[in-house]
């Protein structure tokens, strides 16, 4: 009986160490940024037709302007959007559908 208790204690200790290692390695990894959306402002200004358009925001970035909608000339901040990959699967009816991987 003592050997069984020792074995259970050993398994619990190994499991706790494994879980601790998983969490500590995740915390030490930094997010890699490519910098295309950082520390650059985007603008909302009128085009040649007088319509307010947003400029200075490349694909993959979001321009957030903290000004009222009626303010035509305004500056904003760019944020990088997260990217996800989608996979296409075929349903039983034969029509393709798009699903996000978990």
UniProtKB/Swiss-Prot annotation:
Q: Name one GO cellular component term.
A: extracellular region
| Disulfide bond sites | 37-61, 42-63
Keyword Lipoprotein on this protein? no
Assigned keywords, A-Z: Complement system impairing toxin, Disulfide bond, Secreted, Signal, Toxin
Gene Ontology MF: a single term: toxin activity
Instruction: Spell out the subcellular localization from the entry.
Output: Secreted
Expression by tissue, per the entry, reads: Expressed in salivary glands.
CDD domains, A to Z: C5_RaCI-like
According to the record, the signal peptide region is: 1-24
Q: Which family does it belong to?
A: Belongs to the RaCI family.
Describe the function of this protein.
Complement inhibitor. Prevents complement-mediated C5 activation by binding to C5. Binds C5 at a different binding site than the other tick complement inhibitors OmCI and CirpT1, and the drug eculizumab.
Name of this protein = Complement inhibitor RaCI6
The source organism is: Dermacentor andersoni (Rocky mountain wood tick)
